[in-house]
From Swiss-Prot:
One of its GO terms (cellular component) is cytoplasm. It holds the Pfam family PCMT. InterPro entries: PCMT, SAM-dependent_MTases_sf. HAMAP family: PIMT. It comes from the Archaea. It is found in: Cytoplasm. Transmembrane segments: none annotated. The active site is at S65. This is Protein-L-isoaspartate O-methyltransferase. Catalyzes the methyl esterification of L-isoaspartyl residues in peptides and proteins that result from spontaneous decomposition of normal L-aspartyl and L-asparaginyl residues. It plays a role in the repair and/or degradation of damaged proteins. GO terms for biological process: methylation; protein modification process; protein repair. The gene is pcm. Signal peptide: none annotated. It comes from Pyrococcus horikoshii (strain ATCC 700860 / DSM 12428 / JCM 9974 / NBRC 100139 / OT-3). PROSITE patterns: PCMT.
Length: 220
């Protein structure tokens, strides 16, 4: 198995490549990627592949997204210190760790699979991330107790934009969500809530995510 130094060197090269390709655009996203390397959020047998720009398996038949995809979503979200952010679909905990590093405050992340709640909590603890709160529940309903949010980032594909998530945004807030078919193809939408409560949608092109299962997502 590669040692930590080797893993980090490979990870640094991935970050440099994403920068050179114009995918990582901001210093804050670059800093977060360097502070929270992906190999801390996968099982030991996948650590040596963590620098590869592709999704990797995590427990319960789910995946950790490719680094370029995570960077794209974070750049669209344009997070700032002090923002109140909800993540839907904790998975490995990596994306939540990156968000927490950028906003420098508490981040709430919902996961519906108990095994992944435990997996993410272990990963976050190992990575020394203390400001991510992982909640077991149906992420398609959002998390009203800590709303309204400046941003909601959804890491699973929905059949349509879930109403509760829009309702839980602050005016001027952003929802980043893949919307489309069950498994194969979605479009990455940036949903901006206007001051009057109406929404403006920007389409950032085709993506492929695991399905968002829940009351306002897909049925199992």
């Amino acid at each position: 198995m590669m040692d930590e130094k080797e893993l980090y060197e490979k990870w640094k090269r991935t970050v440099e490549m994403l920068k050179a390709e114009g995918i990582i655009k901001s210093e804050k996203v670059e800093r977060a990627f360097l502070k929270c390397p992906r190999y801390l959020f996968v099982e030991d047998r996948y650590k040596k592949y963590a620098h590869v720009d592709e999704p990797l398996p995590i427990p319960a038949g789910q995946t950790i997204s490719a680094p370029h995809m995570v960077a794209i979503m974070l750049e669209i979200a344009d997070l700032k210190p002090g923002m109140n952010v909800l993540e839907v679909g904790t998975g490995s905990g990596w994306n939540a760790a990156l968000i927490a590093e950028i906003v420098k405050g508490d981040v709430y992340s919902i996961e519906r699979i108990p095994e992944l709640v435990e997996f993410a909590k272990r990963n976050l603890e190992r990575a020394g991330v203390k400001n991510v709160h992982v909640i077991l529940g149906d992420g398609s309903k959002g998390f009203p107790p800590k709303s309204p949010y400046d941003a909601i980032i959804v890491t699973a594909g929905a059949p349509e934009i879930p109403k509760p998530l829009v309702e839980q945004l602050k005016p001027g807030g952003k929802l980043i969500i893949p919307v489309g078919s069950y498994h194969l193809w979605q479009e990455l939408l940036e949903v901006i809530k206007r001051e009057d409560g109406s929404i403006k949608i920007k389409n950032h092109g085709g993506v492929a995510f695991v399905p968002l299962i829940g009351e306002h997502g897909w049925r199992e």
